[in-house]
Amino acid sequence: VYGFQIDLNTSFTGEDSLDISLDAGNGATAAGSLTGPLAEFDINGGSEALTVDGVSYTFPVGDSMTVIVGDNTDGSALFTTACAYGGPSDTLSDCANVNAGITNGGFAVGAAYDFGNGLTAAVGYAGPETGIMTEESADAYGANVAFDGGNYGLSLTYGSLEDAGTDEDTYTALNAYYSFDSGISISAGYEVGDIGGALAAVDETEAYFIGVNGEVGPGELGAAIGTVGSMQEAGGAIPERLMYEAYYSY
């Protein structure tokens, strides 16, 4: 099993960026996506031919605003999640911001504003390439506020995801990190969600995470524990299913 990806970018003014992602791989199942442990490593699959995976254009508007427009791009591309952890698995690297940071791809547009002194705010939209913002389409909207104090940070993210009908799922994620002078960082995240249209006994979701990482020798050592994605309520209670990892990279 293998996956290959190359990211190309260029600038027309020195302040903008045109980004194109090309990938290939043979790791997909017959259903078209990876399952099991391999899915955690974001291995491209589906075609061994080189394909265009995403195209986006990012540009400034004035001195403090940045705008992005893209295809097969996340609506949260300009969001800031206060998390210093970045391990090998996709799930724990989300830092419990599983659904609020909308990542459903498709056509996307977003904007971020830098207020200065570490405070930023951003909004984003993502939906299918056809039927954008219609009653029949499954659209996603999100907003994010973050503060970065240099060695610590906080962020609050809200996401609203529509299904093909009239129901709407909403999620709110809170993230924080702190970096010590020794180079060790601690990150934590917590997300709650409400499944629109679901019965009262199964309409809540929860995700949480805590991770530690820092420089050790020539590389980085880290470990984390958290829920296996977003856990949905069952029978009036949210089940506890955890995953953990430890890594060393150099």
Located regions from the model:
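Alpha-helix capping and helix-loop boundary segments enriched in small/acidic/polar residues
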Residues: 132-133
